[in-house]
Amino acid sequence: MTNIRKSHPLFKIINDSFIDLPAPSSISSWWNFGSLLGVCLAVQILTGLFLAMHYTPDTATAFYSVTHICRDVNYGWVLRYLHANGASMFFICLFLHVGRGIYYGSYTFSETWNIGIILLFAVMATAFMGYVLPWGQMSFWGATVITNLLSAIPYVGTTLVEWVWGGFSVDKATLTRFFALHFLLPFIISAMVMVHLLFLHETGSNNPTGIPSDVDMIPFHPYYTIKDILGLVLMLMALLSLVLFAPDLLGDPDNYTPANPLNTPPHIKPEWYFLFAYAILRSIPNKLGGVVALVLSILVLAVIPLLHTSKQRSMTFRPLSQCLFWLLVADLLTLTWIGGQPVEHPFIIIGQLASILYFLIILVLMPLASIAENHLLKW
């Protein structure tokens, strides 16, 4: 009799995906972030579900329902801060996961990569709508500013904004639909994650060398289950430290003031993980141009596979490309810093230069460096 995990229709799928899956023997800790993202998603869905049991999506009571969760619900404060800081961990893991994909050339798995980009957009949309729900000052004004960007679309813009708002301003209808969509999207994301994994398992994982590893594969369990558990423990330690010692470290103090349409905060800014894109948006004086740049700042990832001019897949043995990659990382950190600063000299010019450099590195310098490396290696 064959083992039930290899014969049962349902267990067989799980077995082929997480137990007997052949994995390259050389994959490093940079390959841990996929499983960490799965854990982040599960944590967000569970904490979100319990928060939704106590939350009321109504402009009059939303802010006070969140206060009620923190003060009166058993361990409600843990749920709320796990959910808020869990989103930050989610984005840290996402950025590292995408960075790993760029560095090691994993983007050559085009289906997996493109679904990953769609997932990134979906997670960003979910996080944005979630930020609106506590109905604090930054929630309200963030929603107003970001949804207003749709009005830059020629001809249909204004109609589209009013359609999203459900009225002539961000109000009760907006909050209700944002709550409904914020609840729904993580389940759609979960389904897309399965498709992401389906395409990944069609090709098998990449590895740090970028060389096909079919000749040297090991089973996922126990080797990588143990390795993933180590990553998981480290991530949970970081998350719990944040939740229990500095829960408001990454939040905005303005969001502890109930939303007031008559009083604009001095600096409207999104959560830290959107600041790089927000800086790119602000660096262009034209509204439509800014919106286009904002979308392109993420969509540019879809062009990376088309601009792969190197004869090697990974950057492991490509020092020029490595320098540009780390310059890109430094540039993104600069943009994140600028996004949180007021719109005044010298921050405006720094933001504009960093935005130009961001697109220049990805679209021009990296392909040119790859061609140069090919010539240096006489390929």
Swiss-Prot record:
Further remark: Heme 1 (or BL or b562) is low-potential and absorbs at about 562 nm, and heme 2 (or BH or b566) is high-potential and absorbs at about 566 nm.
GO cellular component, one term: respiratory chain complex III
Subunit record text: The cytochrome bc1 complex contains 11 subunits: 3 respiratory subunits (MT-CYB, CYC1 and UQCRFS1), 2 core proteins (UQCRC1 and UQCRC2) and 6 low-molecular weight proteins (UQCRH/QCR6, UQCRB/QCR7, UQCRQ/QCR8, UQCR10/QCR9, UQCR11/QCR10 and a cleavage product of UQCRFS1). This cytochrome bc1 complex then forms a dimer.
Source organism of the structure: Rhinolophus monoceros (Formosan lesser horseshoe bat)
Binding site for a ubiquinone: H201
Protein name listed in UniProt: Cytochrome b
Residues reported in the UniProt entry to bind heme b b566: H97, H196
Residues binding heme b b562, per UniProt: H83, H182
Biological processes per GO annotation: mitochondrial electron transport, ubiquinol to cytochrome c
Cofactor(s) the record lists: heme b
Pfam families named among the record's database cross-references: Cytochrom_B_C, Cytochrome_B
Keyword Nucleotide-binding part of the UniProt annotation: no
Superkingdom classification of source: Eukaryota
Membrane-spanning ranges: 33-53, 77-98, 113-133, 178-198, 226-246, 288-308, 320-340, 347-367
Protein family according to the UniProt entry: Belongs to the cytochrome b family.
Name of the gene this protein is made from: MT-CYB
Record keywords: Electron transport, Heme, Iron, Membrane, Metal-binding, Mitochondrion, Mitochondrion inner membrane, Respiratory chain, Transmembrane, Transmembrane helix, Transport, Ubiquinone
One example GO MF annotation: metal ion binding
Cofactor note: Binds 2 heme b groups non-covalently.
Topological relation to the membrane, as annotated: Multi-pass membrane protein
Role this protein plays: Component of the ubiquinol-cytochrome c reductase complex (complex III or cytochrome b-c1 complex) that is part of the mitochondrial respiratory chain. The b-c1 complex mediates electron transfer from ubiquinol to cytochrome c. Contributes to the generation of a proton gradient across the mitochondrial membrane that is then used for ATP synthesis.
Compartments, as annotated in UniProt: Mitochondrion inner membrane
Keyword Amino-acid biosynthesis: no
